[in-house]
């Protein structure tokens, strides 16, 4: 069974409003199903944008040094997961690993 992915909207993982999904396959090995992804439409995007606007109103009130600390931690997490992210990008897009590593 492959992994089923969802949209992250307003702090929750949700399916597309239509309930529809699409398959994403490894272009180097078409038999490898990477996962099922939500087939999002305008309504899903509108909901995500609305949630982002509300979140921004709170985020903009966070003092800049605190925002900087949060963004630095996000960067640290991404760096610590660089190899994992590179391998997933290679599987998903068919790029060579050296390129997805940056």
Please state what every model-predicted region is:
Residues 30-102:
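Glycine-rich loop-to-alpha-helix module at the N-terminal edge of alpha/beta enzyme cores
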């Amino acid at each position: 069974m492959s992994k089923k992915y969802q949209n992250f909207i307003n702090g929750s993982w949700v399916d597309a409003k239509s309930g529809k999904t699409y398959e994403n396959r490894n272009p180097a090995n078409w038999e490898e199903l990477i996962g099922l992804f939500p087939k999002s439409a305008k309504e899903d995007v509108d909901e995500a944008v609305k949630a982002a606007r509300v979140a921004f109103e709170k985020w903009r009130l966070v003092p800049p040094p605190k925002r900087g600390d949060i963004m630095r931690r996000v960067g640290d997490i991404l760096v610590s997961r660089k190899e994992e992210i590179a391998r997933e990008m290679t599987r998903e897009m068919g790029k060579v690993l050296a390129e997805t590593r940056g």
